[in-house]
Regions:
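Short, conserved beta-turn/loop elements at beta-strand boundaries and strand-helix junctions
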Residues: 64-69, 118-119
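Conserved hydrophobic positions within beta-strands
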Residues: 59-62, 98
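Beta-strand/loop nucleic-acid-binding surfaces
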Residues: 92-102
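Short functional micro-motifs and their immediate structural scaffolds
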Residues: 36-37, 49-51
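The −1 position to Zn-ligating cysteines in a subset of zinc-ribbon hairpins
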Residues: 25-30, 41
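Cys/His-coordinated zinc-binding microdomains
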Residues: 30-33, 46
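OB-fold/S1-family single-stranded nucleic acid-binding modules
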Residues: 114-133
Length: 133
């Protein structure tokens, strides 16, 4: 079974287009606040008109969980899988998958972006940085 596909809209298209080219982007407001996922207004000051910025691809592993139960049939053959909260070096946080090094995960470990693909869909996943190995 295929994984659920994201809904690509005019609002989030820059995010998906950037991933398709191998890098990650996030939105930043004139007030300085940065975030993911995409939205029309700043979650901090509610000002519209954010700009897109390219992320360095570096981040910090804040927390993670290991799923041993498939809550969607498409995940049944992937068990167990790791879902993590990563804070990008630029500030935004995102829920993502950790694709390797599971036995060496520790809080505050440095991680690097790895764009993975599920069929034609690019996904922002992360792996432990070489400095963490």
């Amino acid at each position: 079974m295929d994984l659920p596909r994201p809904e690509i809209t005019d609002l989030n298209r820059p995010y998906w287009d950037a991933l398709d080219q191998g890098h990650l982007v996030f939105q930043r407001c004139g007030c300085g606040h940065a975030w993911l996922p995409a939205r029309h207004e700043c979650p901090s000051c509610l000002r519209p008109g954010a700009t897109w910025e390219r992320a360095s691809g570096r981040g910090t592993l804040l927390s993670w969980v290991v799923y041993h139960t498939a809550y969607h049939p498409a995940f049944a053959d992937r068990l167990p899988y790791h879902v993590a909260l990563v804070q990008l070096a630029e500030g935004p946080r995102l829920l993502t998958r950790i694709v390797d090094g599971h036995e060496r995960l520790v809080g505050d470990a440095p991680v690097d972006l790895q764009v993975s693909r599920e069929g034609e869909v690019p996904l922002a996943t992360f792996r432990l940085a070489a400095t963490a190995l």
